[in-house]
Amino acid sequence: MFAAGLAPFYASNFSLWSAAYCSSAGPGGCSFPLDPAAVKKPSFCIADILHAGVGDLGAAPEGLAGASAAALTAHLGSVHPHASFQAAARSPLRPTPVVAPSEVPAGFPQRLSPLSAAYHHHHPQQQQQQQQPQQQQPPPPPRAGALQPPASGTRVVPNPHHSGSAPAPSSKDLKFGIDRILSAEFDPKVKEGNTLRDLTSLLTGGRPAGVHLSGLQPSAGQFFASLDPINEASAILSPLNSNPRNSVQHQFQDTFPGPYAVLTKDTMPQTYKRKRSWSRAVFSNLQRKGLEKRFEIQKYVTKPDRKQLAAMLGLTDAQVKVWFQNRRMKWRHSKEAQAQKDKDKEAGEKPSGGAPAADGEQDERSPSRSEGEAESESSDSESLDMAPSDTERTEGSERSLHQTTVIKAPVTGALITASSAGSGGSSGGGGNSFSFSSASSLSSSSTSAGCASSLGGGGASELLPATQPTASSAPKSPEPAQGALGCL
């Protein structure tokens, strides 16, 4: 909105009007001649706009020419009689607010500012001269869709009668307009429908000369011709439908063999399984045996040997290389498994092997133990209340007899002589029993008999303690000594 307080500032500091119109010698005369002191090159710097006339014009109190400001105010008052325009008595930085006119003069369009309205108001004769030739020579009717530029030197006046004859091109008419891009023509589904429609038109319409479709099935053209356009429209307009065109394409895929088969992503078989870039080599028995024999001889083959082996077995160098790598890995695993198995076996044999050795030691110790039983003073049988068996008694008696006859022969002879000497004073039964006891083992009964005979003769009683340690095979105990003492 135009503010009247800035009008003197703009009029005096900017050359909005040329000197031909703003000077007194201009055409038609100008009621507000431009101050010659204020005429300078226009500047659009913000500092020059705000402080345009502060230091340049010292005569004027606010940096504005008083005559030019008063003339412009009077001019604006004559143009707009309903509005009150006052001279800018204050600084142009804080102009006096003025109410804008409520009614715009009917002779000027709404988009023209009051300054341009004043310009047009002071030159009505020039406007009338320009409008008269236009009325005398009406322009030829423009063609539909053709845009005619306005003639030079004429002012374009909006005419409501000619506005509808040459409309602006819409976005639909443009090839790459927004409406065309967003339209259904760019939809891929619609494009497929158009392709089917073109095929149908080619089959049902005229065929070019020299083209014979005898190889095709006769029902192909009828099938495409019988496609209902309603189904196509429903397929386009109903996106929630489950692709009805799939069934149509599957139906005519077999109908049109060769180049007419429609190959799209819907008709192509969906194979999501990833195909391996390499295939597993299958070796024959002969090849496997040859590789195994070579592996037994040589675990690592050199490149020349590998090529020679591959040529002999009918394999490639890469196949032989991979086979040897896998075979070496298998061989290492088998060796590690065998070593672990042997280690576990050895660990299991150690505890079980110690038991037989202990049993053997016990068996070795048992004979010496049995031999020492005859000479040692052990009371195991008495403490455990166990009597020796008959076999032990017989063995002990034989060994004691052998020892007495070999080692203690003079003692036994002494015993015999002593017993014979002592038997003279005693009864015959007592002597016989004593001699029997000296030849056999000394048991409890023999000792008692010996004691009875010794009571008769004192010579034999002195030799009895000497014969007991050597002749008895039973373990020694304090009982025989006590019995002998009792007898004494």
UniProtKB/Swiss-Prot annotation:
Any one GO CC term of the record: nucleus
Tissue: Low level in normal B and T-cells, high level in activated lymphocytes and monocytes. Also found in thymus, tonsil, bone marrow, developing vessels, and fetal brain.
SMART domains: HOX
InterPro entries: H2.0_Homeobox_TF (IPR052497), HD (IPR001356), HD_metazoa (IPR020479), Homeobox_CS (IPR017970), Homeodomain-like_sf (IPR009057), HTH_motif (IPR000047)
Alphabetized UniProt keyword annotations: Differentiation, DNA-binding, Homeobox, Nucleus, Transcription, Transcription regulation
Ranges of the DNA-binding region feature: 276-335
Tagged with keyword GTP-binding: no
Compositional bias per record (Acidic residues), positions renumbered to this chain: 373-383
Cited PROSITE patterns: HOMEOBOX_1, HOMEOBOX_2
Region (Disordered): 118-173, 331-488
Pfam families: Homeodomain (PF00046)
Segments of skewed composition (Low complexity): 125-135, 158-171, 433-454
Biased composition (Basic and acidic residues): 334-349, 363-372, 390-401
Residue ranges, compositional bias (Gly residues): 422-432
GO molecular function: DNA-binding transcription factor activity, RNA polymerase II-specific; sequence-specific DNA binding
Function: Transcription factor required for TBX21/T-bet-dependent maturation of Th1 cells as well as maintenance of Th1-specific gene expression. Involved in embryogenesis and hematopoiesis.
Family: Belongs to the H2.0 homeobox family.
Protein name per Swiss-Prot or TrEMBL: H2.0-like homeobox protein
Species of origin: Homo sapiens (Human)
Underlying gene: HLX
